[in-house]
Structure formats: structure tokens, C-alpha cells
Amino acid sequence: MGETLDRQLGLLRSQLVYRAIPWRGAQLRRFYRRFVPAGGLAFDVGAHLGNRVAAFRQLGARVVALEPQPDFVRQLQRRFGGDPGVTLLPQALGRAPGRARLMVSPRTPTVTTLSGDFIERAGASPSFKGVSWQAGPQVDVATLDGLIARHGQPDFVKIDVEGFELEVLMGASRPLPALSFEFLPAMRDVALACIDRLEALAGPGHYRYAVSMGEQLQLLRPQGEPADALREWLHALPHDGPSGDVHAWGPGAGSGTRR
């Protein structure tokens, strides 16, 4: 009974956060227009309630949406199940195919994760005070390479996986045109390792990088900067500073047109 109530409260909380602002959809479309071209393909890794999925579809792209949490898979199926332009996959991504145990946070489902390191380190941060996790279901895990082989090369990949970002990128063997991944100052080493992975995949200097903070949907340096500048910026963040997303794009991407 208590666990069911916690899950219902968590779902309601997510709905209030992601759907209660009537103009948020327009903000999302404006923000992602440069990365998601009409007629393109976007992967939403960690789709949650699908606010990014909806924005990508409204921009005219096909979407492959991955979400391993059963409650949110059901919500996504209700919302997008009849849309032939959306492929819903109830699974996670990692460095190798297989199965893994979700660690769920019923009252704060946005921080459900596959990363035990995330629970230990982020959970000790003051901003996570009161957040708790428990063992959830076993879920299927695929790779970016497998996803690309099945669905095609994406124009943009959004990665929101609570400390598992590097594991997702380790499942790719070739550069992605454009992508974003979440960072947390308490775990900045994961973000730094993600940058190293991208630079290794594409070669030094291939990507430009820019950060957006929280849900502000605004790049701090829209023109982007090289990897070393972003590394320096991440190192300077206070330990309990706000989270955000790193955006990276290569030549020909980030212009709002198909490659």
C-alpha cells in the first residue's frame, strides 16, 4: 500500500513538473530546433513522460524513445502508442547488451538509475536530501550501436540516465552527429569522462560543446567551445552546484538542417 502510494505520488510529481507549464512545449521546440531537423531522427534515452518526444515530433522528426520504468512506459504508450513516427522501447542503454537491475526512487522517479555509484555519491549531496532508492525490476539493456543498426543514424541523441551517461556512450563505436548528456557537479568526473569518450570517438576538436543549466533551455555559449574550455568550466563548479546538460555537435550539425 505504502509503495503504491509513493509511486502514485512520484508519477503525479513528474506530471506537475513536466506538463503543468503551458508554454514549455514551445520553449522545447525553440531550444531543440537547431539540433533536430524536420525529417530527421532523434533518440530520446530516458524519455520519462515524453515531453522531449513530443517536441521532437512537433519539429517533424521521427523518434526512438527508450524508457525502462514500467509506470512511465505505460504513460508513453498512452500518449504516443498511436503515432507511427514514435518507436517506444521499454529498455535501457549501456556498454553491452544484457539485463540490469533498476534502482528506483518511487517518490522521485526522475532519479531512478542503473548506477550504484550515482546512488552512493549523488545521494550524499545536500540537494538529494530525503531521496531514497530501492531495488526495482530487471530491465533489458541495449547499446547505441545496436539501436543505430536497427533504426538508423540519429541526427540527435538526448541522454538522461542519472549517472549512467558514460556507460551509454561506451556502447557507441562511432561519432554521433549531435547529442546531449546530463551532468551533476557532485559527479563531474563522469561528465569529464564523457567528453573524453566523445573526443576519442570523433578525434580531438571535432565537437563543439555548450551547457544548459537545469530546465532553463538556454545554452550558456550558443556558439559552442572546445573540449578543454568545457573541462575547465566543469572543474570550477561548486560541489553542490546545479545540474544541467552538456550539448555536443560536430561539423554540419546544430544548424537545424539535415546532414
Q: Model segments located where?
A:
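Phosphate/nucleotide-binding beta-alpha loop and adjacent structural elements of enzyme active sites
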Residues: M1-R259
